Curated annotation (Swiss-Prot):
It comes from the Archaea. Belongs to the universal ribosomal protein uL18 family. It comes from Metallosphaera sedula (strain ATCC 51363 / DSM 5348 / JCM 9185 / NBRC 15509 / TH2). This is Large ribosomal subunit protein uL18. This is one of the proteins that bind and probably mediate the attachment of the 5S RNA into the large ribosomal subunit, where it forms part of the central protuberance. Part of the 50S ribosomal subunit. Contacts the 5S and 23S rRNAs. PANTHER family: LARGE RIBOSOMAL SUBUNIT PROTEIN UL18 (PTHR23410:SF12), RIBOSOMAL PROTEIN L5-RELATED (PTHR23410). Gene3D superfamilies: 3.30.420.100. InterPro entries: Rbsml_uL18_euk. It holds the Pfam family Ribosomal_L5e. One of its GO terms (molecular function) is 5S rRNA binding.
């Protein structure tokens, strides 16, 4: 840490690497509604936030753990779960009266094809407008076809590794090769359950 009379200590959340205050400042100046997306090592969290001078107000939110209520048996943080969580949050935001929002990615550095954009794709598909350019969202990955193809290939080549890698899927009663069909079932369940 620097010493001397000219050293200014940064804000605590900046020191901890939790908040980019310049980006936060631009969001506050904009005063538009935001869709806040946070990816953890296990889960996906999506919140729709309105600006208020006293503090931000969360209007609608969804967590990838909630997908279990709709019959989801897959992983809670892959691209498919990201899309479903974004879709669920978008439907809830529409119910709350939000029609558009800007993306708040936090400290995440955007890269083409990242999971965070699958969340935004889900939000857009639910009917909430979010400005998003070409970010490499692949519809096959969105439905989990890449996982199903890999599982099929791995089961033939190395059954032990297959059972190890997909143990959570198998323990929950989902054959990973059936993930695209399961995705459609859960998406329909979300559509019917949230309207």
């Amino acid at each position: 840490m620097a010493h001397g009379p000219n050293y200014k200590v940064k804000y605590r959340r900046r020191r901890e690497g939790k908040t980019n205050y310049y980006r936060r400042y631009t969001y506050v100046l904009n005063r538009s509604d935001r869709v806040v997306v946070r990816l953890t090592n296990k889960y996906v969290i999506v919140q729709f936030v309105k600006f208020d001078p006293k503090g931000d107000i969360t209007v609608a939110a969804a967590h990838s753990r909630e997908l279990m209520k709709f019959g989801w048996k897959g992983d809670e943080n892959n691209s498919t779960a990201c899309y479903l969580t974004g879709y669920l949050a978008g439907l809830r935001a529409k119910k709350a009266g939000m029609t558009s929002a800007s993306a708040d990615l936090g400290l995440f550095t955007p890269t083409k094809g990242a999971r965070i954009f699958y969340v935004l794709k889900g939000v857009i598909d639910s009917g909430v407008k979010v400005p998003m350019g070409d970010v490499g969202v692949n519809n096959d990955r969105l439905a989990g076809k890449h996982i199903a193809e890999y599982a099929k290939k791995l089961e033939q080549e190395d059954p032990d590794k297959y059972r190890g890698l997909f143990s959570r899927y198998l323990a929950r009663g989902l054959d990973p090769k059936d993930l695209p069909a399961h995705f459609k079932e859960v998406l329909n369940s979300i559509k019917s359950g949230e309207k």
